[in-house]
From Swiss-Prot:
Gene3D superfamilies the record matches: Farnesyl Diphosphate Synthase, Terpene synthase, N-terminal domain
Location in or out of the cell: Plastid, Chloroplast
Catalyzed reactions per annotation: (2E)-geranyl diphosphate + H2O = (R)-linalool + diphosphate
Entry's family note: Belongs to the terpene synthase family. Tpsb subfamily.
Transit peptide: 1-40
The name this protein goes by in its record: R-linalool synthase, chloroplastic
Length: 574
């Protein structure tokens, strides 16, 4: 099979969009916004396409025929790939490379048991004689939640305590592995400090494609990348490699397109729900939110089998969007106090004293949350309402704290701002909803992880990273509207910094530190909680970086291209 021809190329650092749109404050979870004037919306108007309206009957027979044909081919390719993983005559390092390619291509979920068996199998010291292999194995083990010590890298240091800087592939592999470190793992900190500057210096001397691979790693290391975007990008890159596995590439393309079709179906359902809810029309403000909400939930929970969980969490996210608009723009102080009190009470009588527009929003939240809880009860037998209600109360109270800060003209302490902001961006709300919707590991002990405050370190780290990336991506626009409390300004104030650039550097350093806390989920709480919910926390941080890592003076960027590639543009092979 020849290499794939991909319609949309996806660099990690997006360029500025040609159309600048007005931005109003909204919870970070639900940015970016898309309007009818954007290039994407013009090409694929959500209000008129058969996909969104559910009127896809003319395409039904064609789709069914294509699905049947591709399904048979996919089954064959799955069997072939499984055989390659199970072969005993393949060198261990080649199996590690195969696993790495499978997971980067976005098809790892088909082979989870086989991958786990390979990674847990004995690996001799002779097979880890080179730095590249040792670092690759370390990264794969930790990425998949398997215990491994970084002490394995000590033997690669010379008498001066340094690694071999002439081994570019080894340094690149080591750098990628070092991004999975946790606090206290000094060997990984030293590895990153050694590898990063040397890789940067070597860029001009490297030949393609290694130069491109090193540049991408220095921009966004693999561990920090959003899974579906990485799959799409790597499918294109992998197809250009002279030694690529044609069957593996074909399987990745077939699967990408199949999952994309599934996402279109999910988006149709979310859009239909949102239109039936009629909240925007009844409130008289806000915009349609289905597309941007779903992009977030897909980034946070990409596995195809969690379709209903994505749909239900996107509904909760859309309501958070509306509530944020109320607190930030439309609500008066006395109304917001009443609304917060009504949320605390959580009963229909509590909304009697609310203005009409708040009653509508309250009823939508009340009914949607109860419907989600009914689904959880039906699917898992667990009662989720006390926990979902609690996280909504926590989130609304956090909004109220921000309103009091801004209305009183007082600046919070940096730590206070970041922790409160982890709630207002919606990180904890999403974590709690998805924990119950996914339904894995719903034991009494595990539920306690979501009752204790502050939240467990990896969950708190995910929310804080989200908050900080939001500030990096939107602080200028928010300051122009008069919202002066952001982590950037608070860093400047508390650390007596003279420039915004210095403060932004401090924010990025804090994000790097928080990733070490987040990585602890892979080696600690995963022994209690299922790895799936740990990966939800990781994906919250990854998706926020995709959305907000752009030129600091622009918020709306070509994320539109990401959305079009993820949901509307299939991969083509030739």
């Amino acid at each position: 099979m020849s290499c794939a021809r991909i319609t949309v190329t996806l660099p990690y650092r997006s360029a500025k969009t040609s159309i600048q749109r007005g931005i109003t404050h909204c919870p970070a979870l639900l940015r970016p916004r898309f309007s009818a004037c954007t290039p994407l919306a013009s090409a694929v108007p959500l209000s008129s396409t058969p996909l969104i309206n559910g009127d896809n009957s003319p395409l039904k027979n064609t789709h069914q025929h294509v699905e049947e044909r591709s399904s048979k081919r996919r089954e064959y390719l799955l069997e072939e790939t499984a055989r390659k993983l199970q072969r005993n005559d393949t060198e261990s390092v080649e199996k590690l490379k195969l696993i790495d390619n499978i997971q980067r291509l976005g098809i790892g979920y088909y082979f989870e048991d086989a991958i786990d068996a390979v990674l847990r199998s004995p690996f001799s010291a002779e097979e880890e004689e080179d730095l590249f292999t040792a670092a690759l194995r370390f990264r794969l083990l930790r990425h998949n939640g398997i215990q491994v010590t970084p002490e394995i890298f000590l033997k690669f240091k010379d008498e001066r305590g340094e690694f071999d800087e002439s081994d570019t592939l080894g340094l690149l592999s080591l750098y990628e592995a070092s991004n999975l470190g946790v606090t206290g793992e000094e060997i990984l900190e030293e590895a990153m400090e050694f590898a990063e500057p040397r890789l940067r210096r070597s860029l001009s001397e490297l030949a393609a494609p290694l130069r491109s691979e090193v540049a991408q790693a220095l921009d966004v290391p693999r561990h920090l990348r959003m899974a579906r975007l990485e799959a799409r990008r790597f499918i294109e890159q992998y197809g250009k490699q002279s030694d690529h596995d044609g069957d593996l590439l074909e399987l990745a393309i077939l699967d990408y397109n199949q999952v994309q079709a599934q996402h279109q179906s999910e988006l149709t359902e979310i859009t239909r729900w949102w239109k039936q809810l009629g909240l925007v029309e009844k409130l008289g403000f806000g915009r349609d939110r289905a597309l941007e909400c779903f992009m977030w939930t897909m980034g946070i929970l990409p596995h195809p089998k969690y379709s209903s969980s994505r749909i239900e969490s996107a509904k909760a996210a859309a309501l958070l969007y509306v509530i944020d608009d109320i607190f930030d723009t439309y609500g008066k102080m006395d109304e917001l106090i009443l609304f917060t009190d009504a949320i605390r009470r959580w009963d229909l009588e509590a909304m009697e004293g609310l203005p009409e527009y708040m009653k509508i929003c309250y009823m939508a939240l009340y009914n949607t949350t109860n419907e989600i809880c009914y689904r959880v009860l039906k699917d898992t037998g667990r009662i989720a309402l006390p926990y979902l209600k609690s996280v909504w109360i926590e989130t609304i109270e956090a909004y109220m704290v921000e309103v009091k800060w801004f209305s009183g003209g007082s600046a919070p302490k940096l730590e206070e701002y970041i922790e409160n902001g982890a709630s207002t961006v919606g990180a904890y709300m999403v974590l709690v909803h998805l924990f119950f919707l996914i339904g894995e590991g719903l034991t009494h002990q595990n539920v306690l992880f979501f009752k204790q405050k502050p939240y467990h370190k990896p969950f708190s780290a995910a929310g804080r990273i989200f908050r900080l990336w939001d500030d990096l991506g939107t602080s200028q626009e928010e300051e122009e509207r008069g919202d002066m409390a952001s982590s950037i300004r608070l860093f400047m104030k508390e650390y007596k910094l003279s420039t915004v650039e210095e403060a932004r550097s401090c924010v990025l350093e804090e994000i790097s530190r928080l990733w070490k806390d987040l990585n602890e989920g892979l080696i600690s709480i995963k022994d209690a909680l299922p790895l799936t919910i740990v990966k939800v926390a990781l994906n919250i941080a990854r998706t926020s970086q995709v959305v907000y890592k752009h030129e600091q003076h622009t918020y709306m960027l070509s994320v539109d291209n990401y959305v079009e590639a993820l949901f509307f543009t299939p991969l083509l092979s030739s």
